[in-house]
């Protein structure tokens, strides 16, 4: 299980819970929590209760390069996606995982409404009390219809835009 992203809102607290859960299941994980600088860490520690138990070493202060991110995704079977609590749509990480054909664990309960959703590929986790069944990790990735992969690709998106405009 891998997570790469900016440490905002309740992400740090949720990552800590998921880390303990994954460790108890004997699974490998890689979490890269990014903050723009160490001053922001102290601001969050003061203002955000989710950061109260955080330490400077829990975060990275240099963004992961795109080629490093791609390497993390390539080496991972499952990616953790934690949307901002006020976000209702899909994250870019979700779209990336469709293209990468990777399993996704997400806090976005609306994802069930999308045509690419399949329970073997996507598990919705409760951000307050995360539970991820062992079976989800053991299931193979289920290939979805090629039309769906195309729809969420850059080419598919451009076709949709230009077809609508013409």
Q: Where do the protein language model's features map onto the residues?
A:
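Nucleotide-sugar donor-binding catalytic core of glycosyltransferases
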Residues: 1-87, 91, 106-111, 117, ...
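Conserved acidic donor-binding segment of nucleotide-sugar-dependent glycosyltransferases
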Residues: 122-129
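Short, loop-centered acidic/histidine patches that primarily coordinate divalent metals
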Residues: 95, 109, 128
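Conserved donor-binding/catalytic loop of nucleotide-activated donor transferases
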Residues: 74-76, 96-102
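A charged, aromatic-enriched C-terminal amphipathic alpha-helix characteristic of glycosyltransferases
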Residues: 129-166
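Solvent-exposed, flexible loop/coil residues
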Residues: 94-96, 121
């Amino acid at each position: 299980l891998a997570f790469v992203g900016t440490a905002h809102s309740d992400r740090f607290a949720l990552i800590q819970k998921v880390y303990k859960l994954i460790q108890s299941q004997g699974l490998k994980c890689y979490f890269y929590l990014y903050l723009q600088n160490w001053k922001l860490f102290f601001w969050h520690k003061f203002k955000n209760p989710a950061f109260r138990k955080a330490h400077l070493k829990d975060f990275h202060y240099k963004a992961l390069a795109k080629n490093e991110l791609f390497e993390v995704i390539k080496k991972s079977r499952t990616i953790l996606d934690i949307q901002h609590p006020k976000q209702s749509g899909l994250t870019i990480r979700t779209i990336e995982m469709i293209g990468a054909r990777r399993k996704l664990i997400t806090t976005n309960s609306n994802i069930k409404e999308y045509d690419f959703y399949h329970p073997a590929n996507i598990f919705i986790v409760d951000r307050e009390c995360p539970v991820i069944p062992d079976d989800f990790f053991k299931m193979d990735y289920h290939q979805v219809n090629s039309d769906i992969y195309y729809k969420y690709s850059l080419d598919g998106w451009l076709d949709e835009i230009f077809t609508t405009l013409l």
